[in-house]
């Protein structure tokens, strides 16, 4: 029997009156604000399938790889990205975040890091996906990108 792990990739960005509220609002925008998130490291099991994020049961405990950035400085460009690479064996995830960097550099760095992780493990990339969000801070802003483990 083959067990398939499902994961969803999501992101969100928002403002709030405080750093915590901005972060919470970004999680809500990403569809993961009403669950308890447990940060895990960066390995996906064999037979992982990437799916759309379903509506999650409020209060449930959900594992995720989470990238986030928060700033209170007006005009800051904040970025959060996750890069996912799968192979026929297993996969890797990296998170990357930044303030006032070119979003393409943040994205490229995430891709480079996940390619390296796969390479040192001797894994051939079958699929590579990047999810990112960028936000220009008005008062207090947050950006989040996540790989959410569903099973």
Curated annotation (Swiss-Prot):
The gene is pdaD. Binds 1 pyruvoyl group covalently per subunit. InterPro entries: Pyr-dep_his/arg-deCO2ase (IPR016104), Pyr-dep_his/arg-deCO2ase_sand (IPR016105), Pyruvoyl-dep_arg_deCO2ase (IPR002724). Pfam families: PvlArgDC. It is an enzyme of class 4 (lyase). This is Pyruvoyl-dependent arginine decarboxylase. GO terms for biological process: arginine catabolic process. Its cofactor is pyruvate. One of its GO terms (molecular function) is arginine decarboxylase activity. Belongs to the PdaD family. The keyword Manganese does not apply. Its EC number is 4.1.1.19. It comes from Methanothermobacter thermautotrophicus (strain ATCC 29096 / DSM 1053 / JCM 10044 / NBRC 100330 / Delta H) (Methanobacterium thermoautotrophicum). Keywords: Decarboxylase, Lyase, Pyruvate. The keyword Lyase applies. The modification Pyruvic acid (Ser) is found at residue 42. The record marks 41-42 as: Cleavage (non-hydrolytic).
